[in-house]
């Protein structure tokens, strides 16, 4: 089942074009370009986004062409519809808006900042099932802690996502 061009086109014209809305129009599709953190950052600073969610076979290609819809893929897999993918898409964007997170500084050190995955996290107790929190994290030396976190981020990225390290913007 493919969503017909005239139905979707009328909806777009009634809601976006008629109101001179400057929001970006996005269609979540496995054919689209991969969605990355940098895209979430771009959308979080835009005038908003409207999402088209196809179902089963998607939407008529003419809608994509006529309304300059940006096709975005949420991963290398296929879902029955774009609704579930839209939750992840929106969450990645909304969490970057001012006031959404309690500590906005934490955004700077999480996965994909500097094209690195995030370092390991630890809580109390200091030892659990014979595994101890690394001594450097208990040292109070913030410079050494930052260095350890950076090293661990690089190790984890090399192991799980070496493709991220190929980007020339990554600082080892």
What are the residue ranges of the model-derived segments?
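Short, small-residue-biased leader/transition segments that mark boundaries at the very start
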Residues: 1-3
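S-adenosyl-L-methionine/SAH cofactor-binding core of RNA-modifying enzymes
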Residues: 5-55, 60
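Alpha-helical scaffold segments in soluble metabolic enzymes
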Residues: 10, 14, 88, 92, ...
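Short glycine- and Lys/Arg-enriched binding-loop motifs that mark or flank ligand-binding interfaces
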Residues: 50, 71, 77-78, 126, ...
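Structured adenosyl-cofactor binding patch, chiefly the S-adenosyl-L-methionine
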Residues: 59, 63-110
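Internal, active-site/partner-interface "lid" segment
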Residues: 84, 96-135
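SAM-dependent methyltransferases
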Residues: 126-172
């Amino acid at each position: 089942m493919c969503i017909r061009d005239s139905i979707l086109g009328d909806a777009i014209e009634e809601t976006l074009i008629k109101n001179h809305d400057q929001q970006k129009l996005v269609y979540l599709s496995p054919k689209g370009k991969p969605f990355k953190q940098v895209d979430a950052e771009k959308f979080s600073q835009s005038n908003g986004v409207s999402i088209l969610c196809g179902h089963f076979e998607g939407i008529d290609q003419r809608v994509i062409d006529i309304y300059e819809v940006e096709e975005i893929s949420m991963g290398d897999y296929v879902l029955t519809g774009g609704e579930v993918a839209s939750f992840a898409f929106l969450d990645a964007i909304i969490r970057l808006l001012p006031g959404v997170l309690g500590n906005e500084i934490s955004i700077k050190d999480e996965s994909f900042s500097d094209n690195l995955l995030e370092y390991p996290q630890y809580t109390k107790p200091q030892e659990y099932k014979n595994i101890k929190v690394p001594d450097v994290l208990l040292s109070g030396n913030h410079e050494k802690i930052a260095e350890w976190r950076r090293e661990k981020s690089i190790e984890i990225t090399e192991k799980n996502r070496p493709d991220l390290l190929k980007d020339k913007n990554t600082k080892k």
